[in-house]
Amino acid sequence: MVPEKMAYVLAALIFTISMVYFVVAWQAIGEMASAETTDEKLGSKMEVSLFSIVGCSYLGMGAWILMKKLYTPIPYAIVAIGSAVMIGIYMVAITSGVPVLGVETEADPFATIAKILQGGIIGMAVFLIPSTVRISEKMPKINR
């Protein structure tokens, strides 16, 4: 596939995962309303904050990629690293647990969807980084 078209596919994946994170944040708001203890409320507040920030960050990165296309590798690197960090946080949450939240015991379909999308985002972003470097080398140099 042509790298220019892959940038659009990557942006579509990024916008999709941002919507997934907003849905998960909305679910956490519902859990916060039904929380009984202060620890449960604190955990829900942390989840809402994390998922809202991640969703907004993905929206910003998707917009940056659409605006700059293949002229800079920076948003591709940020998206790949950020997605890897989110997968790492999820792995910690299901194995050893997060201090306030504890170990994640429920099998959440949104978490599975998010991790599949993030794997695709990492693969596409890493694949597109060399294309950005080649395109920027072909650009004319400005003599000042």
Regions found by a protein language model. Name each.
Residues 1-144:
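Membrane-interface extramembranous regions
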